[in-house]
UniProtKB/Swiss-Prot annotation:
Protein name as catalogued: Glycerol kinase
EC number: 2.7.1.30
Gene (name only): glpK
Species the sequence originates in: Shewanella baltica (strain OS223)
GO biological process terms on file: glycerol catabolic process; glycerol metabolic process; glycerol-3-phosphate metabolic process
Pfam families membership: FGGY_C, FGGY_N
Function recorded in the entry: Key enzyme in the regulation of glycerol uptake and metabolism. Catalyzes the phosphorylation of glycerol to yield sn-glycerol 3-phosphate.
Length: 494
């Protein structure tokens, strides 16, 4: 039977999804299932790895059944995933020895402080491109080995395996035959040397993690093994894998140096491809691994904003200013400007490029004339201002002045926000027709790996832009508005 489709498994922080794409990169079918968030202690976040697998495997069955697609028609399955989340399981049984420790979990802060005391902060920064932070997988692994009974002894005997979620899914799909990750996920463990593209022995030693625990690192665009849907039907190749933000970068076809995308979700993630050069950031950004036009390793600068769409949720849930996120565009457009109002949404501190955990949210410039519309508009503008902060930091680090910014995520449906983003950055903003760019990136990698598509050039002909947003304010206005934002940020940090 002719291979007509590629399936992307998009395993996220709150839900597992499966999306079927046809040869023209159109979405044919989508299935999604949420799973349980576990908070056993303050600052701790866990998932049940078996529930993740159950949700992901069920949507895979469902998405094909819903569209009436037979496994014979599927060329490949690609994977994209929440990054950093850590699973350790028994090699012999496939049984997890503990819940998955989620990227948001802060329990390994003390381990990070111990590494800093050993003088490893600069080594981590130089060799992994990351900050020494509990966000990343390495200290989570150590916590499990130190705190789960018999775990360290089992690990020393080579009886345990570690994986981020991509690795766990491939292991389950291939029925325990394949233990593998890709460079984009390996680069988020804080154990991977991004220059030699190998596991870093010094960091493994510092954290007392046996090398036998770790998966083999294979290219993001390659075949890892085969699977059968629910154990039935024809074998399908499992091929193509990348962490969620790098998958979105590839899905937007940002495969050349200087190309960038911004994902507007709960927070914002801005990534710029820097080609074959790992650019060290002096402005609070991370250096990480991306995927090049032929599936090879490229590098990227990455910056994250904590409060993007979450700011709009705050307007709705805490202030009651709107009923639905989509209402913000209507109210923001009812006023010509914010009337001097700035909202700095530092509710959990400030992310890149400031990295100030002690900053707190504030509204500035309120007068008797300020109303709901001004505050809503200021909230939307804060998302664009924070993204400009990241973009300016990337320009300083890379020496590249961006001319076009590709965007994706839920908030890109807001035309007001996208136009203001173009205005305040003086950069053309491009919104794609298919905004499921994370899943699309996984599908592209899988399809290229098995020859379903021939090259990135072919994919470029399938990528359609829904709307171009052209900068529409002058330099003087732009400078005045941004100076007001910078002043507001400085005051939240005072």
């Amino acid at each position: 039977m002719q291979k007509k489709y590629v399936v992307a498994l998009d395993q996220g922080t709150t839900s597992s999804r499966a999306i079927v794409f046809d040869h023209d990169a159109n979405i044919v079918s989508v299935s999604q299932r949420e799973f349980t968030q576990l908070y056993p202690n303050p600052g701790w976040v866990e998932h049940d790895p078996m529930e993740i697998w159950a949700s992901q495997s069920s949507v895979l069955v469902e998405v094909l059944a819903r569209a009436g697609i037979h496994s014979d028609e599927v060329a490949a399955i690609g994977i994209t995933n929440q990054r950093e989340t850590t699973v350790i399981w028994e090699k012999a049984t496939g049984k997890p020895i503990y819940n998955a420790i989620v990227w948001q979990c802060r329990r390994s802060s003390e381990i990070c402080e111990q590494l800093k005391a050993q003088g490893l902060e600069e080594y981590v920064r130089e060799n992994t491109g990351l900050l020494l932070d509990p966000y990343f997988s390495g200290t989570k692994i150590k916590w499990i080995l130190d705190n789960v009974p018999n775990a360290r002894a089992q690990a020393e005997r080579g009886e345990l395996l570690f994986g981020t979620i991509d690795t766990w899914l491939v292991w389950k799909l291939t029925e325990g035959k394949v233990h593998v990750t890709d460079p984009t996920n390996a680069a988020r463990t804080m154990l991977f040397n991004i220059h030699s593209l190998t596991w870093d022995n010094k960091l493994l030693e510092a954290l007392d993690i046996p090398l036998s625990l770790l998966p083999e690192v294979k290219p993001s665009c390659s075949v890892y093994g085969t699977t059968r849907i629910a154990g039935e039907g024809s074998e399908i190749q499992v091929a193509g894998m990348a962490g969620d933000q790098q998958a979105a970068l590839f899905g937007q076809l940002c495969v050349e140096p200087g190309m960038a995308k911004n994902t507007y979700g709960t927070g914002c993630f801005l990534l710029m491809n820097t080609g074959t050069k790992a650019v060290r950031s002096n402005h609070g950004l991370l250096t990480t691994v991306a995927v090049g036009p032929k599936g090879e390793v490229n590098y990227a600068l990455e910056g994250s904003v904590f409060m993007g769409g979450a700011t709009i949720q705050w307007l709705r849930d805490e202030l009651g200013l709107i009923r639905d996120a989509s209402d913000t565009e209507y109210f923001a457009s009812k006023v010509a400007d914010t009337n001097g109002v700035y909202l700095v949404p530092a509710f959990v501190g400030l992310g890149a490029p400031y990295w100030d955990p002690n900053a707190r949210g504030a509204l500035f410039g309120l007068t008797r004339g300020a109303n709901r519309n001004h505050i809503i508009r200021a909230a939307l503008e804060s998302i664009a201002y924070q993204s400009k902060d990241l973009l300016d930091a990337m320009t300083k680090d890379s020496g590249v002045s961006l001319k076009r910014l590709k965007v994706d995520g839920g908030a890109v449906a807001n035309d007001f926000l996208m136009q203001f983003q173009a205005d305040i950055t003086d950069v053309e903003v491009l919104r794609p027709s298919v905004c499921e760019t994370t899943a699309l990136g996984a599908a592209f990698l899988a399809g290229l790996a098995v020859g379903f598509w021939e090259s990135v050039i072919e994919l470029e002909h399938k990528a359609c832009i829904d709307k171009h947003f052209i900068p529409n304010i002058d330099a003087e206005n732009r400078g005045r508005l941004y100076a007001g934002w910078q002043d507001a940020v400085a005051r939240t940090r005072a």
